[in-house]
């Protein structure tokens, strides 16, 4: 059995990466969303082990100390991170994993696991990104301005990713990710065991 593909998805706020990932998971089998660990309090409807692994600050810092995380970050006084063991076990079982994280975390994952596939979700235009952020009606103009400044930085960092997928239409963006993962599975570097089995060399 070939190992699964670790697909790391990032993109600026408002680009629709969460919607694209959700559509992908609903559409394609044998693909799972990596469950992150966090020290923040559970919100109504969230379940431990499904939405997040809810940890105390001490438990999370112990995970950092034991090198149990692929990546982690601190945001609004809470830790967020990706448990290494769960991801590795799923990949070894041949499952494909979608990891939706910000750019610094994605580049850290690539350092540790060079075989990971980094996909950056791009807006059709910067104007469209601004329109989507304003259309959410969830943030003040000041917050939107900060998010747009951050978005410009992230769009530049996307040059370090493996692929760019423009989210003009959610279903189409989801299909493009599927094509990328499918093509990655055909790479010679991922099929050396098959070559040896067939050729005996």
Locations of regions flagged by a protein language model:
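NTP-dependent small-molecule kinase module
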Residues: 138-139, 153-201
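Walker A/P-loop
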Residues: 18
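P-loop (Walker A) phosphate-binding loop of NTP-binding proteins
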Residues: 10-12
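ATP-dependent small-molecule kinase phosphotransfer cores
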Residues: 38-97, 104-107
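Conserved phosphate-donor/acceptor-positioning beta-strand/loop module used by diverse small-molecule
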Residues: 97-102, 111-135, 166-167
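Post-Walker A helix-loop "phosphate-sensing" segment adjacent to the P-loop in P-loop NTPases
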Residues: 25-34
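ATP-binding Walker
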Residues: 15
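Short hydrophobic/aromatic beta-strand immediately N-terminal to the Walker A/P-loop
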Residues: 6-8
């Amino acid at each position: 059995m070939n190992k699964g593909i670790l697909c790391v998805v990032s993109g600026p706020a408002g680009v629709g990466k969460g919607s694209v990932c959700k559509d992908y998971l609903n559409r394609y089998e044998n693909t799972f969303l990596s469950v992150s660990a966090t020290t923040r309090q559970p919100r109504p409807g969230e379940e431990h082990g499904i939405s997040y692994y809810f940890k105390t600050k001490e438990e999370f810092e112990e995970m950092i100390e034991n090198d149990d995380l692929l990546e982690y970050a601190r945001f609004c006084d809470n830790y967020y991170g990706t448990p290494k063991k769960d991801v590795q076990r799923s990949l070894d079982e041949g499952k494909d994993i979608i990891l939706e994280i910000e750019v610094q975390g994605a580049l850290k994952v690539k350092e540790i696991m060079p075989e990971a596939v980094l996909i950056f979700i791009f807006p059709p235009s910067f104007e469209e990104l601004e329109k989507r952020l304003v259309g959410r009606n969830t943030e003040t103009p000041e917050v939107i301005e900060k998010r747009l400044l951050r978005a410009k930085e992230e769009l530049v960092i996307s040059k370090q990713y493996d692929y760019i997928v423009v989210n003009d239409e959610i279903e189409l963006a989801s299909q493009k990710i599927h094509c990328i993962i499918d093509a990655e599975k055909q790479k010679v570097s991922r099929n050396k065991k098959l070559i040896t089995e067939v050729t005996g060399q």
